[in-house]
């Protein structure tokens, strides 16, 4: 698994690709998909072709020029800043999943210093990906829920009083 940092426009591209993946799930989840041109859909070359068991899928993004308005460097200006990393899995679509990681345990105060009387916590969103599974010459696809950390927020700590 490879990890790299990702910022603004790349994050938007990831989100758009995720939505695209969800759009074709009703077709792809019900079928075995042989070679379609994208390496995600390719079976081993030694496997015989499956007659009538294919579909064409254009994974290009429609209206890619429409940008989602995002504030610049929101991950650095937050009172609970975070970094973006990308995980790579060739048997998952999308193969790249962006995750946020909180930079601090505490929150950043008005003076720019960490305040440990507050807690920086991850904001998580459950999303669907497509998982490719090989069983001999058979390739199947299955929906998988993944928990993606999309940012961090500052909260008051939970204090338990011992009696």
Swiss-Prot record:
Localization annotation: Secreted
Which residue positions does the secretion signal occupy? Answer: 1-30
Covalent S-S links between cysteines:
102-152, 107-154
Q: Biological process GO annotation list?
A: adaptive immune response; cartilage development; defense response to Gram-negative bacterium; defense response to Gram-positive bacterium; inflammatory response; innate immune response; interleukin-17-mediated signaling pathway; negative regulation of angiogenesis
Summed up, the tissue specificity of this protein is:
Expressed in T-helper 1 and T-helper 2 cells, basophils and mast cells.
Q: Which GO terms describe its molecular function?
A: cytokine activity; cytokine binding; cytokine receptor binding; protein heterodimerization activity; protein homodimerization activity
Keyword match Secreted: yes
The entry's family comment says: Belongs to the IL-17 family.
As annotated, the protein's associated disorder is:
Candidiasis, familial, 6: A primary immunodeficiency disorder with altered immune responses and impaired clearance of fungal infections, selective against Candida. It is characterized by persistent and/or recurrent infections of the skin, nails and mucous membranes caused by organisms of the genus Candida, mainly Candida albicans.
Q: What does this protein do?
A: Effector cytokine of innate and adaptive immune system involved in antimicrobial host defense and maintenance of tissue integrity. IL17A-IL17F signals via IL17RA-IL17RC heterodimeric receptor complex, triggering homotypic interaction of IL17RA and IL17RC chains with TRAF3IP2 adapter through SEFIR domains. This leads to downstream TRAF6-mediated activation of NF-kappa-B and MAPkinase pathways ultimately resulting in transcriptional activation of cytokines, chemokines, antimicrobial peptides and matrix metalloproteinases, with potential strong immune inflammation.
Name of the featured protein? Interleukin-17F
Species of origin reads: Homo sapiens
Per the UniProt record, the lineage of the source organism begins with: Eukaryota, Metazoa, Chordata, Craniata, Vertebrata
């Amino acid at each position: 698994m490879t990890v790299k940092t990702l910022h603004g426009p790349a994050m938007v591209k990831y989100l758009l690709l995720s939505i695209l993946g969800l759009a074709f799930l009703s077709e792809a989840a019900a079928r075995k998909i042989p070679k379609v041109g994208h390496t995600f859909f390719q079976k081993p070359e030694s496997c015989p072709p499956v007659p009538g068991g294919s579909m064409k899928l254009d994974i290009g993004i429609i209206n890619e020029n429409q940008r989602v308005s995002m504030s610049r460097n929101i991950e650095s200006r937050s009172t609970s800043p975070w970094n973006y990393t990308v995980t790579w899995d060739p048997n998952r679509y999308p193969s790249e999943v962006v995750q946020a990681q909180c930079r601090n345990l505490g929150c950043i105060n008005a003076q720019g210093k960490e305040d440990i009387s507050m807690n920086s916590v991850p904001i998580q969103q459950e999303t669907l990906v497509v998982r490719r599974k090989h069983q001999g010459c058979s390739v199947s696809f299955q929906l998988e829920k993944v928990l993606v950390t999309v940012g961090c927020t500052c909260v008051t700590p939970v204090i338990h009083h011992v009696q």
